[in-house]
């Protein structure tokens, strides 16, 4: 079941690029291919670089063919790769037997780290900063020596021979874009790492392979047959994936350029999510079976886990950024219809906005709230179950009690809640019960979520308690199948956790708690994430953890609970979910998922006919069960209507104190007196009125020189002056005044809050803040020529907190300080003091709008221009924006909100109403109310009689 209303992403892997053409910029730019050439070559693939250059993408071949096919041209890099592979094979033969296992384990781990960490780092910096292309440009690798600008003509000639030998058609290195040439060089590095990774793994498996003692022929034959089948399946997955995505996505081509064609995906991409990283590693476990070695199995699991980390950290962020960018923010004029009725409705809604909606999610450890009754009760009951399981003896009586308890909770979770949901679907029984007592539908929904969450928690906790009672710690882990059962069992538990996480991410809180049983669903059915491949993932892999725990305990009662749980899950899907889904969505329901389609399409005709016959028998027999369940449901449902029922800490981490000396050789000839730095920003309104008559934290001593006070989050413009011969790698950093004890050497890192004095001197996107550099400046000293520059600190380069800050000008990419700005303060204007005239939502909106715009970087695609305009989609995707806003609200209005409130409200008007509602609730406890009366009871303490 998938009732999520979000757009389907359809992007599950870097090898799975479904919308490449739509992602290519159509901006006017220099093109290396004319329209006439395109028409003359209609079957060619065209690529487009980030600057808009269009070029023909030549045909290339996979690395195995390039290396081992004698018909393919060979070059020096092929010889190098083959020589390194031969060295691996020689080592497996020549090393002493006692050293083969540890050495080849280290060799494989080295190449796996080169893959996941090395390639991962290169791809990350290329995705974020285009760093590989910058390196190639800076080193002038592809600069034609005829121009006289290439310092290494021999390297250019070598690269030209290497690359052009591999691609005889449609490719000339001198004519190809820089991005494409860089990608080709990157490919050769990838070829080396991947081939060595695979060969070293196979050699490690060979040196670990052995025949277990007393292994029978049947077990050995089954082990080899299954192992060979898994390796063959793995080979087919790789070949079919390469057939679909070609070399472009195989080698992460879209980190460098985009292709101008629609990509079609079928075959293996219909079977499983991330097929290259999920089922594409089945061969590892097949080889482990053939080797009959736990060492190979464990190193396979480690490598597989590292590959999933690579997917999550490197590929998925790039996919989201490239193929699924946030949609543009809706403007106010596009949100309001031109019809009078819509306009009137809009005016009414703005005058009397509805009560702010709750955004307190329940699922997940990060949503745990000890002050919420459901979470509090869950912790107490889980603690009770754990205590009982630990303190009671594991006698047959107690074991039986725990098993029965687990079965009862499983029955309640599947049958009891299933009956309630069925009655809710047919007659809104649960909602009507609360309406009868004057509650609302929203209250019924909250109570249902609590009941379901608590029931699910106790169902699984009671099952784990029963497993604990039935489990016997192995006396010998090497005996029989003990270790294998634990490994497979833990893997099945991990599979169920991943399945549940994928389901929750796809459905959200609304779908997880069956929200369409309680409210009319306005969204369309979407099939994304795990639902792209399976209609009901709970049917097969949703209970894998039950069978995993049964394997680990190897207990017949636990196997019985797992069987009951699986059967009840199938029944819940068939008799609770499916009828409701058919009633709500009707013909919009998908009949076959991606995996089912692929399997049916792959079956031979005789098997297809047999499958149709089996389906007919199943449908005929199903009517009997339906009639039986209808009768049972009526009886079980009788009387069911009477059933009732962040903290955070901020740590600033600093490295050890630097030991840089102020007297550094490269400082010779530079006088700090010739450097200066100043700044301008948006001043805080009324910031100069600091001195008051109050004995409070607001009281300040007036002085002649006023400290500059800037708005929270407003951009700060920095101007610097330096000698004309200053280092090209000078830079300016932003620090809190209290962070550095020394005025000569900076002791703490900037954490990204810095901008270089000149562009193109560093490899990252820090150049974005540069406005001007090395402009002639008025010289205060006749003997020294001065230059000046300007830069802007905004967005992530600011400290999103209140405090006193300073800018520091540093010399030559080091931490030697040449100039320090005057201290300045960043502060939020408090609007909850007794002398601040904030009387209603309109005043709150007026105070909040400019701060929210600052928090959203004043970006037109994110920040609203008016209180009615919606926030950009970036606010939902990146929590940093919401954290900035709630910090500002907390210090401006004295009301603390969770970050999830900001994207849930979506505009300033709703946020203002939420603030007013919260302040109204908290008004009796507000300190400002008490400040209106004298702080000391003078009359009582000093009577007039005295």
From Swiss-Prot:
> Pfam family of this protein, just one?
PEMT
The pathway to which it is assigned is: Phospholipid metabolism; phosphatidylcholine biosynthesis
- This protein's major location comes to endoplasmic reticulum
**What are the annotated GO cellular component locations?**
cortical endoplasmic reticulum; endoplasmic reticulum membrane; perinuclear endoplasmic reticulum
- According to the UniProt entry, what is the EC number of this protein? 2.1.1.17
Q: Where in the cell is it found?
A: Endoplasmic reticulum membrane
What are the start and end residues of every segment in region (Disordered)? 1-51, 322-355
GO molecular function list: phosphatidylethanolamine N-methyltransferase activity
Q: Where is the composition biased (Basic and acidic residues)?
A: 33-42
Protein's membrane topology: Multi-pass membrane protein
The record lists the catalysed reaction(s) as: a 1,2-diacyl-sn-glycero-3-phosphoethanolamine + S-adenosyl-L-methionine = a 1,2-diacyl-sn-glycero-3-phospho-N-methylethanolamine + S-adenosyl-L-homocysteine + H(+)
- Spell out the Low complexity composition-biased ranges: 335-344
Q: Where are the Lumenal topological domains?
A: 1-78, 124-188, 238-266, 315-377, 422-447, 498-555
Please provide the Gene Ontology terms (biological process) for this protein: methylation; phosphatidylcholine biosynthetic process
Indicate the enzyme's highest-level EC class: transferase
TM segments? 79-99, 103-123, 189-209, 217-237, 267-287, 294-314, 378-398, 401-421, 448-468, 477-497, 556-576
Which regions face the Cytoplasmic side of the membrane? 100-102, 210-216, 288-293, 399-400, 469-476, 577-946
Database matches in Gene3D superfamilies: 2.60.40.2840
Family label: Belongs to the class VI-like SAM-binding methyltransferase superfamily. CHO2 family.
Database matches in HAMAP family = PEMT
Function recorded in the entry: Catalyzes the first step of the methylation pathway of phosphatidylcholine biosynthesis, the SAM-dependent methylation of phosphatidylethanolamine (PE) to phosphatidylmonomethylethanolamine (PMME).
Record-given protein name: Phosphatidylethanolamine N-methyltransferase
Species, as recorded: Chaetomium globosum (strain ATCC 6205 / CBS 148.51 / DSM 1962 / NBRC 6347 / NRRL 1970) (Soil fungus)
Q: Which gene holds the coding sequence for this protein? A: CHO2
